[in-house]
Amino acid sequence: METPTPPLPSKDQLFPPLIQLVRALLWVLVITIGGAIVQRLFFHPLRKIPGPLTAAISGWDEFYHNIWRDGEWCKTYPKLHKEYNSPVIRIGPNHVHLNDIDAYETVFRVGTNFYKDKTFYTCADNDGSIFSLCDRDEHSERRKVLSSLFSKQAAEMTAPKVMSKLNELLDFMITQSKEGKACNITDLFRALAINWVADTLLGDCGDVVTYAETKPDLLEDIDGLSKLIPTLRFFPYLIPTLNSLAPSTSPAGVAKFKKICENYTRPRINDPIKNISQRSRASVVELLIAHRHEVYHKPPTVDYLAEEAFTFIDAGVDTTGGTLVAAIYHILRDPGILRRLREELDESQLFLSKGTPIDFKKLGNLPYLNAVINESHRIWPALPGPLPRVVPPEGLQVGSFFVPSGTILSSTHHCLHYNETVFPEPKKFKPERWLRTDKWEGDRYLNPYSRGSRACIGINLAQMELRLTLGHLFSHYDLQLCEPTLSSLEWKDHFVAHPKAPVMIHIGFRKA
């Protein structure tokens, strides 16, 4: 009689401990996620602040709009504030957005105790730079060291070099146009901004980038890093990890810039006082070297100086360069604006001939030029997205809502600059709105350089560059948008406003 074959054991019999462990882990995961959702919806300190359900539960809204849709998150805020009829909305589990000018001025004031959110400002692994310093006292000390370079008087001293670098670019553009080639001013004026900033950083170092038909490597790398920032919000250790795995690897443009910084820095790093005294105007790097010697009695590292320099370059490219492109585009789109601007420039006689010394007081008081620049800042918010701050222990009252301590709080320039009550028809470029003689709220809402203690240190330099460039350009040159012209100038939020398409022009000397 044959013995029957025993049945094969089931999977549960073969791997009982593993199956039970997986089941247990799944239950733990479900309970943890479910508990977090319940806590965020019904027991969180922000539960009474209105906003999308998905935003209260997770960071999905930010991920979807900023990464999947590529930098569109901050453009949803005005609609959300309207939908919920509230000056404050919840845009994340512990993140709120303000659209209230009084609250904005409380948060972004001189001496504010609403500190920068460290997880946001250090995600690009640049936590030693002046921009990313979150400690108020440490930032104040660093700013004092550099402030002499960024006063109005110091900015005016740089005018000859600003004009020299501008004329180099215009000569290149004239040559391009004579050859029948269109000029990509989106890349060219941003490249010019790099060379302007580099002059303040490194003094007489020559041009960091050259002008060509193709985008310079350094500009390509800056754009790549900016595009990566929304991703770094979710993976903040990505760059530090990559740097630790391949510390000597840098993109081509960044590597070349660091080499320029190294060549400039090494002869100065151990004897800063002597080198500064030999020049009428120190550079940012020289002042940082001197400060390190004075406070720490030792020189800074070359890597530290290169990182600080790169942060300045990164900050200056799209703020000044992008605003110039926006101004030129909108001026050329409206013959009436171009005519009125030229009439004012011609009447001022400030730009009669190249090389004429500029009366900066008179230049700063040209009403229509200033109106064009203000409107360019408004319609092209250089930093359109959230600039997160941490609510201090006393909290913040916004209308009928109380925002508790520890909440991450943001207020965006895009929302302020496109406020329909203050700026009717906000998508239209209307410089005349800045020529009003009555008291209005426009100046309070226009904050292209932010406000308070953490406002952009380079505001005087940037404004001088904008006035000089637009004044010189439209006094001496004829510009024409290439066909087909863009119907509008659109941007996406890569921390800075990044153009969706380039502006192309032809240029020639102005006919008498």
UniProtKB/Swiss-Prot annotation:
* Positions bearing carbohydrate: 184, 263, 275, 374, 419
Record's subcellular location? Membrane
Q: Which cofactor does it need?
A: heme
Query: What's the biotech application?
Result: Hancockiamide D displays potent cytotoxic activity against murine myeloma NS-1 cells, suggesting a potential antitumour application. More interestingly, hancockiamide C, the likely end metabolite of the hkm pathway, shows potent Arabidopsis thaliana seed anti-germination activity, but is inactive against the monocot Eragrostis tef seed, suggesting that it could be a herbicidal lead targeting monocots. The herbicidal activity of hancockiamide C could be due to its phenylpropanoid-like structural features, which may act on the plant lignan pathways, and hence warrants further investigations.
Leader sequence segment: none
UniProt GO cellular component terms: membrane
The record's listing under InterPro entries reads:
Cyt_P450 (IPR001128), Cyt_P450_E_grp-I (IPR002401), Cyt_P450_sf (IPR036396), Cytochrome_P450_monoxygenase (IPR050121)
What family does the entry list?
Answer: Belongs to the cytochrome P450 family.
Q: Which PANTHER family match?
A: CYTOCHROME P450, CYTOCHROME P450 MONOOXYGENASE ASQL-RELATED
Q: What is this protein called?
A: Cytochrome P450 monooxygenase hkm5
Q: Which organism is it from?
A: Aspergillus hancockii
At the highest ranks, the source species' classification is: Eukaryota, Fungi, Dikarya, Ascomycota, Pezizomycotina
